[in-house]
Amino acid sequence: MIRFAQYARYPVISRLMKPTVISPFQAQAFSSSSVMLKTLNQTIRNKEKRPEKTNKQSVALEGSPFRRGVCTRVFTVKPKKPNSAVRKVARVRLSTGRSVTAYIPGIGHNAQEHAVVLLRGGRAQDCPGVQYHVVRGVYDIAGVAGRVTSRSKYGVKKPKAA
């Protein structure tokens, strides 16, 4: 005798084992053939597949950690209240064809129109619409000059020991 408790670890089967009540409105009217239900083995074999969760923060990267793009415009924006600054950003046409706005981190940059850049996810929190960061020290964007601390974030090589 099979008990309901044995199928507790299979959520699909446990749902099938529960008694169901079918109202007359759910039954197919004027149907000559009966409704085909799945057998227990078919239910085990074809388990419900849950869709993979996608990262909704960086949609334009299309699942990649980085994307290459070409700068179409380099400009500055002012951040939201209460912050006050002039943030350097670039409008970038990605290799996928999308056009996004990316933040250029660090002090000073050599980004110009038609410069090839590498983008990563990660938004500038106080700039609306800026959802991506330019990776410094890759392609046409140089690393931050004179940077000693946090060099890996700004694309700077280790200085030569004198």
UniProtKB/Swiss-Prot annotation:
Function: Component of the mitochondrial ribosome (mitoribosome), a dedicated translation machinery responsible for the synthesis of mitochondrial genome-encoded proteins, including at least some of the essential transmembrane subunits of the mitochondrial respiratory chain. The mitoribosomes are attached to the mitochondrial inner membrane and translation products are cotranslationally integrated into the membrane. uS12m is required for respiratory growth.
One Gene Ontology CC term in the entry: mitochondrial small ribosomal subunit
Transit peptide endpoints, chain numbering: 1-37
Key word Glycoprotein present: no
Species of the source: Schizosaccharomyces pombe (strain 972 / ATCC 24843) (Fission yeast)
InterPro entries according to UniProt: NA-bd_OB-fold, Ribosomal_uS12, Ribosomal_uS12_bac
Gene Ontology terms for molecular function: structural constituent of ribosome
Pfam families listed in its UniProt record: Ribosom_S12_S23
Location of this chain's protein in the cell: Mitochondrion
GO biological process terms, semicolon-separated: mitochondrial translation; translation
Main subcellular localisation: mitochondrion
This protein's UniProt keywords: Mitochondrion, Ribonucleoprotein, Ribosomal protein, Transit peptide
Family: Belongs to the universal ribosomal protein uS12 family.
Chain ranges passing through the membrane: none
Organism superkingdom: Eukaryota
Subunit text: Component of the mitochondrial small ribosomal subunit (mt-SSU). Mature yeast 74S mitochondrial ribosomes consist of a small (37S) and a large (54S) subunit. The 37S small subunit contains a 15S ribosomal RNA (15S mt-rRNA) and at least 32 different proteins. The 54S large subunit contains a 21S rRNA (21S mt-rRNA) and at least 45 different proteins. uS12m forms part of the decoding center of the mt-SSU.
PROSITE patterns with a match to the protein in the record: RIBOSOMAL_S12 (PS00055)
Protein name: Small ribosomal subunit protein uS12m
